[in-house]
């Protein structure tokens, strides 16, 4: 898109490349803006006369790190937000300029939250730039809380569902990794939404690798843990510790995403099937 708009695009192998640093200095920029990028060397973020600002998708100081969108949902938070701040030597620790809060439902997915914050973030950045331009910024130091929640990078081990977890935690993992936007659209960026997955084994020992895109949680606990319930038409329920989850949308390896009724129409589940 930048190339279409005839905006210069540079892709240096190293951010400390002398030619790249010289190019940035030649711009004589008032301000640099960073979104979803790794740590910048000081020799770069100190170049502009007003410094360098970052847009972060959490309410700092909580959820510093690479995966704030996912981690707030996986942890079952009821609120998150976005923050603009001045970059300094430490990751996501600079002085806060502006913040905006966003309420979360118990079913918000990572893809949905990504899009919400993307749109709100553009407005917050515009407001931040205006404040800097008008010399009206009253930035504040980040609070030095004793128990700050972190947002480390996602890893492959996290994405596989551990069925020994409580039902609500599994539901939060599913939505915290889910690309589901609407019934007709999924976010395609797997770095943001890799999907939680498990193996479903038939009574004939056929193994389906299943990515879960959408689930619903219920506190109902009067059934055998790890048992499966289905009407073979419209619902697929897995009974778990402290509740159950209904699978509403899934994706088999190498296939397109489908809703549960489509899956059940071609697969006759019974109590002999195993989740792993």
Question: Where are the language model's segments positioned?
Answer:
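Well-formed, non-transmembrane alpha-helical positions, independent of function
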Residues: 1, 23, 43-46, 72, ...
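N-terminal glycine-/serine-/threonine-rich beta1-alpha1-beta2 phosphate-ribose binding loop
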Residues: 1-30
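Residues at alpha-helix termini
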Residues: 4, 26, 74-75, 266
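Short beta->alpha connector loops
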Residues: 13-16, 37-39, 218
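Short beta->alpha linker loops
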Residues: 15-16, 64, 165
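Donor/substrate-binding cores of folate-linked one-carbon enzymes
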Residues: 29-161
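Internal anion-binding site segments
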Residues: 145-276
């Amino acid at each position: 898109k930048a190339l279409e708009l005839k905006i210069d695009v540079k892709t240096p192998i190293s951010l400390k490349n002398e030619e790249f640093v010289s190019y940035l200095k030649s711009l004589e920029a008032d301000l640099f803006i960073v979104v979803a990028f790794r740590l910048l060397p000081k020799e770069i973020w100190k170049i502009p006369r007003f410094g360098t600002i970052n847009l972060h998708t959490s309410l700092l100081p909580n959820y510093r790190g690479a995966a704030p969108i996912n981690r707030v949902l996986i942890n079952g938070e009821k609120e998150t937000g976005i923050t603009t701040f001045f970059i300094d030597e430490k990751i996501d620790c600079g002085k806060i300029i502006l913040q905006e809060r966003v309420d979360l439902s118990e079913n918000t997915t990572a893809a949905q939250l990504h899009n919400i914050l993307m749109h709100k973030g553009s407005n917050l950045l515009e407001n931040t730039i205006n404040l800097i331009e008008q010399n009206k910024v009253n930035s504040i130091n980040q609070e030095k809380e004793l128990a700050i929640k972190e947002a480390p990078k996602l890893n492959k081990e996290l994405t596989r569902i551990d069925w020994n977890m409580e039902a609500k935690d599994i539901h939060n993992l599913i939505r915290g990794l889910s690309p589901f936007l609407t019934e007709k659209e999924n976010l395609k960026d797997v770095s943001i939404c890799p999907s939680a997955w498990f193996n479903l084994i038939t009574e004939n020992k056929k193994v389906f690798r299943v990515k879960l895109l959408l689930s619903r949680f219920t506190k109902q606990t009067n059934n055998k843990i790890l048992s499966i319930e289905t009407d073979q038409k419209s619902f697929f329920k897995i009974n778990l510790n402290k509740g159950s989850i209904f699978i509403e949308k899934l994706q088999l390896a190498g296939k397109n995403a489908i809703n549960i009724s489509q899956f059940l129409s071609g697969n006759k589940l019974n109590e002999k099937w195993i989740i792993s």
